[in-house]
UniProtKB/Swiss-Prot annotation:
GO terms for cellular component: helical viral capsid; host cell; host cell nucleus; ribonucleoprotein complex; viral nucleocapsid. Signal peptide: none annotated. A motif (Bipartite nuclear localization signal) lies at residues 198-216. Homomultimerizes to form the nucleocapsid. May bind host exportin-1/XPO1. Binds to viral genomic RNA. Protein-RNA contacts are mediated by a combination of electrostatic interactions between positively charged residues and the phosphate backbone and planar interactions between aromatic side chains and bases. Belongs to the influenza viruses nucleoprotein family. Residues 1-21 are annotated as: Disordered. It is found in: Virion; Host nucleus. This is Nucleoprotein. It comes from the Viruses. It comes from Influenza A virus (strain A/Whale/Pacific ocean/19/1976 H1N3). Late in virus-infected cells, may be cleaved from a 56-kDa protein to a 53-kDa protein by a cellular caspase. This cleavage might be a marker for the onset of apoptosis in infected cells or have a specific function in virus host interaction.
Length: 498
């Protein structure tokens, strides 16, 4: 994404491949998810999980977290050098839920990381299969995006909580590579940069010496990633200024916050991929599906089709609504936390409600929660239609970037208007257009003022029937223009705490 000449498709980023043709890409992505599936089956055998227990999303998440922890070299090294009480740096584990005498029991398991790595490599033809690990990270990130709010993190870096729609991928680990960078929202990149600049302000040695040089390279790389997400010349020029600053400080923080706000209307291009829980790939492999031979894509019909035929269960707390739990996981599976609810509802075929109206907490169960009253139910992850995932941000034509709602980052390439409250957004841009970026700021504000909420994004793009795998007959939905489609409207979700 960094420069025009080297655009690789998501799948190439995902599988670390150089330019490949469509068939090769489909095969390598297929190899990646097939490896995840084989690993999951092997882990279920190791843990002696019943078929039902193996389809429990909480068990899937524990197994995914174990393999991610086993390959987290930085943290493993840190744990070995700083032994903390009661933590064995060589072991990893988590809660596994089993059905005993009509009740759900929690069992804490511990495994050697070495053993987990062996099982993972064995499932992936002896390779480290980093792409598969990144894929699991993105699934966890998408789940966090749908489940938690980042108000506190936004406020801490001096940003406005209403900018939540820019925060896709904010919980992705740093080691998530190019595929991870592609799915990070503008706000996430801005926040990472601001944290870095603040450290530099507080710690004189941050930019100095041998370490400082590495820090500087990382800073410039992050600036370039963010620059690549912007689609207007003025926004990109401002990013050049931030990157080239000799000694990044408050002026750069100001510029970055300005750019983040501008992205509410002049949308950045952020990739969306449907990353599914490991148990879903496991089920498909177990039923004899050959991912590598059939090929697979994260941005087409394949994930929809997979979910159409998979039965996944979830633990449900006493007062939770199973339909709402299903919505949460459906949104996570399709990376649709920041999508317009009108579009999501149309594709899913059932109404998708704002988070403030959900009677459900997160998917993961804390270790201090009582298992006595825990129930389980089937997650409804099927959809009525499918649509192609987008990476464009939905500006109507590339140069004159158009409207974007104050809380939408489109996931699906489907025609719609992007309603937004221009007054709300423009109010944030009070006067401050002096300084070295003044001409760019003026230009950005001018573009924002000329954006019209009634403009149509993704002109002519529609959804497809699930029988239409070649995407031949687009069905262009018509939406009620007035209805605001923000998932975070009237939000009351928990904060994300690491």
């Amino acid at each position: 994404m960094a420069s025009q000449g080297t655009k690789r498709s998501y799948e190439q980023m995902e599988t670390g491949g150089e330019r490949q043709n469509a068939t090769e890409i489909r095969a390598s992505v297929g190899r990646m998810v097939g490896g995840i599936g084989r690993f999951y089956i092997q882990m279920c055998t190791e843990l002696k999980l019943s078929d039902y227990e193996g389809r429990l999303i909480q068990n899937s998440i524990t197994i995914e977290r174990m393999v991610l922890s086993a390959f987290d070299e930085r943290r493993n090294k840190y744990l070995e050098e700083h032994p903390s009480a009661g933590k064995d740096p060589k072991k990893t584990g988590g809660p596994i839920y089993r059905r005993r005498d009509g009740k759900w029991m929690r069992e804490l398991i511990l495994y050697d990381k070495e053993e987990i790595r062996r099982i993972w490599r064995q499932a992936n033809n002896g390779e480290d299969a980093t792409a598969g690990l990144t894929h699991l990270m993105i699934w966890h990130s998408n789940l966090n995006d749908a489940t938690y709010q980042r108000t506190r993190a936004l406020v801490r870096t001096g940003m406005d909580p209403r900018m939540c729609s820019l925060m896709q991928g904010s919980t992705l680990p740093r080691r998530s590579g190019a595929a991870g960078a592609a799915v990070k929202g503008v706000g996430t990149m801005v926040m990472e940069l601001i944290r870095m600049i603040k450290r530099g302000i507080n710690d004189r040695n941050f930019w100095r010496g041998e370490n400082g040089r590495r820090t500087r390279i990382a800073y410039e790389r992050m600036c370039n990633i963010l620059k690549g997400k912007f689609q207007t010349a003025a926004q990109r020029a401002m990013m050049d200024q931030v990157r080239e600053s000799r000694n990044p400080g408050n002026a750069e923080i100001e510029d970055l916050i300005f750019l983040a706000r501008s992205a509410l209307i002049l949308r950045g291009s952020v990739a969306h991929k449907s990353c599914l829980p490991a148990c879903v790939y496991g089920l498909a492999v177990a039923s004899g599906y050959e991912f590598e031979r059939e090929g697979y894509s994260l941005v087409g019909i394949d994930p929809f089709r997979l979910l159409q035929n998979s039965q996944v269960f979830s633990l449900i707390r006493p007062k939770e609504n199973p339909a709402h739990k299903s919505q949460l996981v459906w949104m996570a599976c399709h990376s649709a936390a920041f999508e317009d609810l009108r579009v999501s509802s149309f594709i899913r075929g059932t109404r998708v409600v704002p988070r403030g109206q959900l009677s459900t907490r997160g998917v993961q169960i804390a270790s201090n929660e009582n298992m006595e009253a825990m129930d389980s139910s089937t997650l409804e992850l099927r959809s009525r239609y499918w649509a192609i995932r987008t990476r464009s941000g939905g500006n109507t034509n590339q140069q004159r970037a158009s409207a974007g709602q104050i809380s939408v980052q489109p996931t699906f390439s489907v025609q719609r208007n992007l309603p937004f409250e221009r007054a709300t957004i423009m109010a944030a841009f009070t006067g401050n257009t002096e300084g070295r970026t003044s001409d760019m700021r003026t230009e950005i504000i001018r573009m924002m003022e000329s954006a019209r909420p009634e403009d149509v994004s993704f002109q002519g793009r529609g959804v497809f029937e699930l029988s239409d795998e070649k995407a031949t007959n687009p069905i262009v939905p018509s939406f009620d223009m007035s209805n605001e489609g923000s998932y975070f409207f009237g939000d009351n979700a928990e904060e994300y705490d690491n």
